Amino acid sequence: MSKYSDAKELAGLTLGKKTDYANQYDPSLLQPVPRSLNRDDLQLGDELPFMGHDIWTLYELSWLNNKGLPQVAVGEVYIPATSANLIESKSFKLYLNSYNQTRFDSWEEVRQRLITDLSHCAGEAVEVAVNSVTHYTQQPIVTMEGECIDEQDIDISSYDFDDRLLEGAAGEEWVTETLHSHLLKSNCLITNQPDWGSVEIRYQGHKIDREKLLRYLVSFREHNEFHEQCVERIFTDLMKYCQPESLTVFARYTRRGGLDINPYRSTEQAKPDHNHRMARQ
């Protein structure tokens, strides 16, 4: 379990508890989780070593127009990594469900409500796009960039998280390369439900030993943290043990409750070049 799984800030969350589903707009359903919980554990101060966003895709976004006709859309939300809070995913789902039987005058009104409520919960301005389903019909299904490290013939017997698996991972050769793995799996901090993801690591620095990197990523398999926290842990551990000159860690998780979360942390830029979904999303 995470060191902070019993933190008082988590006690009031609806996650892991039986809840009623509201169908009338209710922004009070949103629940924040302080980013400081895991950042204190990672010894991160106010000056973060990365830029980034948490990119959410909202696949189950629906409301009524002013004549009562249901509308459906796909939303994209960009929450800055500098915000005080991340948004707890079950509360996000319940909040979106509250739109289902509520009338709005326009799509723009829905977008503005989302911006206002999510920004208030996160503690910083968020960006929101509300797109029609047809917007996505010509978009590609992509994979991660770079080389996949998953096909290594190695024995693994322990699945307990261990950052020391990265000890000695930095070699002599100086490279610029991108690696990825589809074997990232962790567990929800509260419910212990599995979270499945793929992770892309782009860096410039001493060449990272791929076997050590894969063993490290697999060690998340029984680890309990939220998606965003896992990505920040990967970033800080790579910085600690490998000390690259530049580093980007981008994970794309499978959806749950109509939402997927795609945390992006980088020394180079605050957002990825695209937000195309992958085959498992």
From Swiss-Prot:
It catalyses: 7-aminomethyl-7-carbaguanine + 2 NADP(+) = 7-cyano-7-deazaguanine + 2 NADPH + 3 H(+). It is found in: Cytoplasm. NADPH binds at residues 89-90, 256-257. The keyword Cytoplasm applies. Residues 268-281 have a biased composition (Basic and acidic residues). Pathway: tRNA modification; tRNA-queuosine biosynthesis. GO terms for biological process: queuosine biosynthetic process; tRNA modification. GO terms for molecular function: preQ1 synthase activity. Keywords: Cytoplasm, NADP, Oxidoreductase, Queuosine biosynthesis. The active site is at residues 188, 195. Residues 261-281 are annotated as: Disordered. Its EC number is 1.7.1.13. Substrate binds at residues 87-89, 227-228. GO terms for cellular component: cytoplasm. Belongs to the GTP cyclohydrolase I family. QueF type 2 subfamily. NCBIfam families: QueF. Catalyzes the NADPH-dependent reduction of 7-cyano-7-deazaguanine (preQ0) to 7-aminomethyl-7-deazaguanine (preQ1). Homodimer. This is NADPH-dependent 7-cyano-7-deazaguanine reductase. It comes from Vibrio vulnificus (strain YJ016).
